[in-house]
């Protein structure tokens, strides 16, 4: 059963009446451009056909009752009072979004009953949290008929995750969930928020392979990477590493390395990764899948060696995928790191070969069974 059907059904069972409306917000997979978003850089994700559905109805007071179907928990809070953190981690994503919507739209106090469910695997690097934030943001916008654009909802979602949940994420996940386009990957300039859609190449599939090693970005590694990038930006005297050219980096690399080895390595990844994203857009436009595969491999190597966010299980999955796919296509880790998934652009005729090579080898080597998803690029958040 699809999340949107399950949300509608469980809403009726839980509240004893039918939901008025349902919102669906997709997860995302990032083809290339990792950790560049919070450095004001470039990313190239697409929204995927896995996501979060929220069924909801207005109440005649200012209370939100939120039923999390997948874990059978409920949260309740009053929009006429200051919104405080909950002991339930999932509930803070909901409360945080509503809190920052109220900062922008102080008149918003419309109560509601909500039931929500997701088929995005948790802690997989496919943005289950952004799908939750954007679905809640859109729900609030509809409930209050609020004058919020999709980009504004995305930035409110990011604000909630940064300030209320405590993960210093960039804005890519939320922007993709809000603004994704069917059959397109979208290059996002994370400073200007300009979007360049590029069609998914004909004859290719997007495969996502979950290592089933879970990650949790609220822990310190992600935030320390961000601090190291900020150190490097201060060293170069710029607002963000987006503003450092490759030439300027090379000129002062030895000096930065002497001051702070980790900041040097992190900056090397970000500056080279931004360049790879720009080249990837051109490769896709030219249908040059050999070049795109090389860029994806370069991105993975940089995440492994300079940003140091991969783990042995992920590196092994990428190696297997690269062998299976060959030169026409590519594979790399996707998401924040320390587990999660790899993404592959794979010729349609090689999908089963890829699936088989990984099934035959990954569990044997690691003791963990992978999960294989074929995805399509889909539209961003919408009312169903």
UniProtKB/Swiss-Prot annotation:
Site for Transition state stabilizer, residues: 28
UniProt-listed InterPro entries: Galactokinase, Galactokinase_bac, Galactokinase_CS, GalKase_N, GHMP_kinase_C_dom, GHMP_kinase_C_sf, GHMP_kinase_N_dom, GHMP_knse_ATP-bd_CS
Keywords on record: ATP-binding, Carbohydrate metabolism, Cytoplasm, Galactose metabolism, Kinase, Magnesium, Metal-binding, Nucleotide-binding, Transferase
GO molecular function, one term: ATP binding
Catalytic activity as recorded in UniProt: alpha-D-galactose + ATP = alpha-D-galactose 1-phosphate + ADP + H(+)
Residue sites binding substrate per the record: 34-37, 222
Residues noted as binding Mg(2+) in the record, renumbered to the chain: 129, 161
Gene3D superfamilies per the UniProt record, alphabetical: 3.30.230.10, GHMP kinase, C-terminal domain
Domain of life, source organism: Bacteria
Localisation: Cytoplasm
UniProt-listed GO biological process terms: galactose metabolic process
Active site location: 173
EC class: transferase
Keyword Manganese recorded: no
Pathway: Carbohydrate metabolism; galactose metabolism
Entry EC no(s): 2.7.1.6
One cellular-component annotation, GO: cytosol
Biological role: Catalyzes the transfer of the gamma-phosphate of ATP to D-galactose to form alpha-D-galactose-1-phosphate (Gal-1-P).
Family as reported in the entry's similarity comment: Belongs to the GHMP kinase family. GalK subfamily.
Protein name: Galactokinase
Organism expressing this protein natively: Actinobacillus pleuropneumoniae serotype 7 (strain AP76)
